């Protein structure tokens, strides 16, 4: 990307983050674009922000059972976390009442799965879209 394109990426990412401050993918765009612009302080800032949000998710459990599921507030956070862990999502199942189970494979082909508590997402959906 050219410097002008990178500046445009930064502008758009900031606009999106103003509306959705937990958008990990836009933060990654800021790391990428600022790196190309040699803006080291911004790169470090956004890398730290990503790590803090990922750490916040990981601190909610271990993802191995529904009882220890990781809490997420956006469905995409599950896939962002899995990407951070270096695994590849293979399949998805919803496990009532409020868990997403994602089967993954690591780079060697070992299979396992992780649970994500999506209760906050479901509550927000109910609040906004379901007629009483």
Residue ranges and their predicted role:
Residues 34-58, 86:
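TPR/TPR-like (Sel1-like) alpha-helical repeat modules
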Residues 22-30:
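Glycine-rich, often proline-containing surface loops adjacent to acidic residues and nearby aromatics
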Residues 1-10:
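Helix-turn-helix repeat elements of alpha-solenoid scaffolds
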Residues 1, 14, 30-35:
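Conserved small-residue packing positions in alpha-helical repeats and bundles
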Residues 24-25, 52-66:
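Boundary/linker segments of alpha-helical solenoid repeat arrays
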Residues 68-132:
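Terminal, low-structured helical/coil segments at or just beyond the last alpha-helical repeat
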Residues 15-16, 50:
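Canonical positions in the second alpha-helix
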């Amino acid at each position: 990307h050219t410097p002008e394109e990178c500046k445009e990426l930064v502008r758009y990412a900031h606009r999106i983050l103003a509306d959705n401050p937990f958008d990990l993918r836009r933060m990654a765009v800021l790391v990428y674009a600022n790196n190309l612009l040699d803006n080291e302080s911004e790169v470090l800032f956004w890398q730290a922000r990503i790590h803090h949000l990922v750490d916040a998710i990981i601190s909610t459990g271990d993802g191995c059972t529904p009882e220890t599921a990781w809490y997420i507030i956006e469905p995409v956070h599950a896939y962002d976390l899995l990407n951070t862990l270096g695994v590849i999502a293979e399949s998805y199942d919803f496990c009532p009442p409020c868990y997403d189970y994602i089967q993954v494979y690591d780079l060697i082909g070992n299979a396992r799965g992780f649970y994500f508590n999506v209760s906050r997402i479901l509550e927000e959906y109910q609040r906004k879209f379901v007629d009483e």
